[in-house]
């Protein structure tokens, strides 16, 4: 399970450090793709296969389903971690997530989210009513 928040930079070759606690669970390679809220999602291969199967079952006749599947698969890249614990972020994903210099990696149970530091701070500064969200989650059995 991925938990925690880590701050680090991006080098001149668009490489980021994958925190050691995350590397242990990711293995040698993983899938990096566009995420919601203009962040990037990292999935271990096993979790990606589970998501992939669910996405492939969505009806091709549904316009929203097609758009959602395109969104995830068009941005997906298989990424390897080098010996220094770094991973290369493709330029199109850097642009999508507005990543320039500093990033925040957060563990979100089965995936990792990569945020530009600015976007993460904006997200955290937004007036999110977590009590209201908690009520909605309780309706879903959480």
Curated annotation (Swiss-Prot):
GO biological process annotation, one example: negative regulation of DNA-templated transcription initiation
Annotated organism of origin: Clostridium tetani (strain Massachusetts / E88)
Membrane-crossing residue ranges in chain numbering: none
Domain SpoVT-AbrB: 5-47, 76-119
NCBIfam families (UniProt xref): division/cell wall cluster transcriptional repressor MraZ (TIGR00242)
PANTHER family registered for this protein in UniProt: TRANSCRIPTIONAL REGULATOR MRAZ
GO molecular function, one term: DNA-binding transcription factor activity
Gene name tied to this protein: mraZ
Protein origin, superkingdom: Bacteria
CC per GO annotation: cytoplasm; nucleoid
Protein name as annotated: Transcriptional regulator MraZ
Keyword Metal-binding: no
